[in-house]
Regions:
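Active-site-proximal specificity loops/subdomain of glycosyltransferases
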Residues: 65-129
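Conserved donor-nucleotide/metal-binding helix-loop-beta segment in metal-dependent transferases, i.e.
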Residues: 142-172
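Short loop->beta transition adjacent to catalytic acidic/histidine clusters or analogous donor-positioning motifs
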Residues: 32, 56-64
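Short beta-strand-to-loop acidic/aromatic patch adjacent to the donor-nucleotide binding site
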Residues: 130-141
Length: 284
């Protein structure tokens, strides 16, 4: 079908203007592992987030990465593994639409994307390849069992859209031009998966496609200023496996929903009640 997006038209098999693309029927997620991609200095928030997941999924394993932050090895047990790695987030904060093509920023972006792939592989191995995985951060609160729409392989709320600005749209045309060179992929025009809750084997398929076609996909960093943030990079990996992000009405965000405390959403993002002023990335 031909879709009009402002001053642009695209041809695709689905309407990206539709945010809610899910089926009504849901099934519970029972077998899941948690990968904390980047905990920095958020000690109290990290502990609370982990405690919450244990209350809901006590048998799940958790892989925790501190990228240049505090040492969380004191949390280790048979179901939690800790890894101290380099800070790949602070340098990305300084990248914007004006400077992302600078050679040094290209290196930063590519390094961050490689770290995400590595952490996914390490985390899935430790979690023993559960049916589902959750790549998350300390500002996510899982306060109930999560369900998935039948047929979905990647959950999110699809709040971001490629035609937000002309520069974004141009960037996503570039991203999708790269994807179109690879058989079996689908376009990506909406995303917003924080935390990323996805089907493990589908993700592994996407990673395999990414690595086999790295000569093409290494150019992702040249199309858009933040292709490596994991809320976008993982949906790109799923698009490589032919699967879209599917809208989940079980997600909410504290900054968008003033009633989040009393809502029934099991997945809460932007939960920062346990953050301190020095918990954020940057120069502190």
């Amino acid at each position: 079908m031909i879709i009009d997006l402002g001053n642009h038209t695209i041809e695709c098999d689905f309407d990206p203007r539709i945010q809610c693309n899910n089926s009504a029927e849901k099934l519970p997620i029972e077998d899941i592992g948690f990968i904390y991609n980047c905990v920095f200095k958020q000690r109290s928030a990290t502990r609370r987030s982990i405690e919450a997941t244990r209350e809901v999924y006590p048998e799940a394993k958790r892989y925790l990465v501190s990228d240049g932050g505090l040492d969380y090895s004191f949390l280790e047990d048979e179901r939690l593994k800790f890894s101290m790695q380099e800070d790949t987030v602070s340098p990305i904060i300084k990248i914007n639409e004006s400077n992302f093509l600078d050679p040094i920023n290209q290196v930063v972006t590519k390094r961050g994307m490689a770290a995400t792939i590595r952490r996914l592989k390490e985390g899935l191995e430790f979690c023993e390849y559960p049916e589902w995985f959750c790549m998350t951060e300390p500002d996510v609160l899982i306060r109930g069992k999560v369900n998935y729409p039948v047929g979905a392989k990647l959950l999110g709320h699809r709040v971001n859209f490629a035609w937000y600005t002309k520069s974004w749209y141009d960037g996503f045309i570039g991203i999708n031009n790269l994807l179109s060179q690879i058989e079996g992929t689908i376009p990506i025009l909406r995303w917003g998966s924080v935390p990323v809750i996805g089907h493990t084997q589908t993700l592994l398929k996407g990673i395999e496609v990414y690595e086999k076609n790295f000569d093409i996909l290494d150019k992702l960093s040249e199309q858009f200023h933040v292709p490596g943030t994991f809320d976008l990079f993982l949906p790109i990996l799923f698009a490589l496996a032919g699967e879209p992000e599917v809208f989940s009405d079980e997600y909410t965000e504290c900054l968008r929903n003033p009633n989040w405390k009393t809502s029934s959403h099991p997945v809460v993002h932007q939960y920062r009640e346990f953050y301190s002023n020095n918990d954020y990335y940057g120069d502190n």
